[in-house]
Amino acid sequence: MSAEPHPLYRQLPAIDRLLNEPEMAPLLAEYGPVLLADTLRQLQAEAREYIGQFHTLADWCADWPAALRQRLNQRQPALKPVFNLTGTVLHTNLGRAPLAESAIAAVTDAMRSAVTLEYSLEGAGRGHRDRAVADLLCALTGAEDACIVNNNAAAVFLLLTVMAAGKQVVVSRGELVEIGGAFRIPDVMRQAGCELVEVGTTNRTHLKDYRQAINENTGLLMKVHTSNYSIEGFTAAVSEQQLAALGQECSIPTATDLGSGSLVDMTRYGLPAEPMPQQLIAAGVDLVTFSGDKLLGGPQAGIILGKKQWIERLQQHPLKRALRADKMTLAALDATLRLYQQPDRLVEQLPSLRLLTRPASEIAACAQRLLAPLIACYGTDFTLDIESCWSQIGSGSLPVDRLPSWALTFTPKDGRGSTLEALTARWRTLTKPVIGRVADGRLWLDLRCLEDEAALLRELAS
């Protein structure tokens, strides 16, 4: 015989009855009947489970409107702002570069109103969505034209598809990179319908290696900047200028995937050197690709610069429509690029550059200010210290180089890793989660990216 249903189940009110109660009217006006009904079903399922386990009603069953409001208040957006205290400035998993205020304002304006996305005010007709941003890029880099897609992987894929589908692409063996998410250059070439021709060795490639690989089916000579690793020691590589000259001699286009790509000389700000797109354009490279949300400090985007004849081919290919950027991306990119027209104010206005160039002394002072109030909150269970550490740029940018920084460390007094795990798990449930890193039996909060100390203290004291 089947078990009799628990009599307490009959005390659970029908959803229709609950929705018609006067106390529900404000919630109905705020959230609508569909969301309320779905949430009430979840609550009733939990109530039945509670009855089955404890043979009594849960306390919150005495006030369904209050329980419903509490549950609705707990709903969180899929993308939550967090405190990035990992020590990785351009953290791919945490959204890479924070946008400048002017870029945020531009995106907001683009969302609120109709915009001239593909409309020419001068000609009162159809325009091209890349045009305004392309003109800015050309002015900043000296390129003849530019093309914008939704990320750099798309830029590389479009370039290979248009320039070399059914043909051979010659690349140094030492530049066959893999980036996060198993994005491998050989795999991308295969998907684009290209045949990869590896030349040279892992550590040494010469111009003659490229020359010997050229035949009637060669479609592209390519270089890939090894932005997420470094080969040192007994090495040799072909410069973009040398490869471009060979391409011109043999009437074969050349391309370079920069990956990160910076429009300013990073050494000017005390950071390690990184090749700039304008340098490669000046060297004669036909097409250059790089990301918008790494060292550039803008939105996720793939940027292709180069000769007008090749950019026009990219723009005309059907794949471009599938990969094109939307109005919000273009608005943010446009606003970000305009900041580069005032290089003397770039550190002040571009958040990513401001964080990358933040002096270690300023970070140490921040740690000193935070130490005492955090000891008051956590000193019972943890030993808190200020430690020097090294931040990294992230997103495959300048992989070998580190930035001197300072961190607050939390060491559990009971010596248990589970205590650290419990702390980090609790911090991930905060209104604005705090994300650090665990290493050497301690939790490290690298303070390089912390700009609102008061907000952090409010969260950690809650």
From Swiss-Prot:
InterPro entries recorded: PyrdxlP-dep_Trfase, PyrdxlP-dep_Trfase_major, SelA-like, SelA_trans, SelA_trans_N_dom
Known cofactor(s): pyridoxal 5'-phosphate
Primary subcellular site in the record, as a coarse category: cytoplasm
Record field: catalytic activity: L-seryl-tRNA(Sec) + selenophosphate + H(+) = L-selenocysteinyl-tRNA(Sec) + phosphate
Pathway membership: Aminoacyl-tRNA biosynthesis; selenocysteinyl-tRNA(Sec) biosynthesis; selenocysteinyl-tRNA(Sec) from L-seryl-tRNA(Sec) (bacterial route): step 1/1
Enzyme class label: transferase
Protein's GO biological process: conversion of seryl-tRNAsec to selenocys-tRNAsec; selenocysteine incorporation
Highest taxon of the lineage: Bacteria
GO cellular component: cytoplasm
UniProt key word Transferase: yes
EC number(s) recorded for this UniProt protein: 2.9.1.1
SUPFAM superfamilies: PLP-dependent transferases (SSF53383)
GO MF annotations in UniProt: L-seryl-tRNA(Sec) selenium transferase activity
Keywords for this protein: Cytoplasm, Protein biosynthesis, Pyridoxal phosphate, Selenium, Transferase
Modified residues (N6-(pyridoxal phosphate)lysine): K294
Subcellular location: Cytoplasm
NCBIfam families membership: selA
Record-stated family: Belongs to the SelA family.
Subunit structure: Homodecamer; pentamer of dimers. Binds only one seryl-tRNA(Sec) per dimer.
Protein role: Converts seryl-tRNA(Sec) to selenocysteinyl-tRNA(Sec) required for selenoprotein biosynthesis.
UniProt-recorded name of the protein: L-seryl-tRNA(Sec) selenium transferase
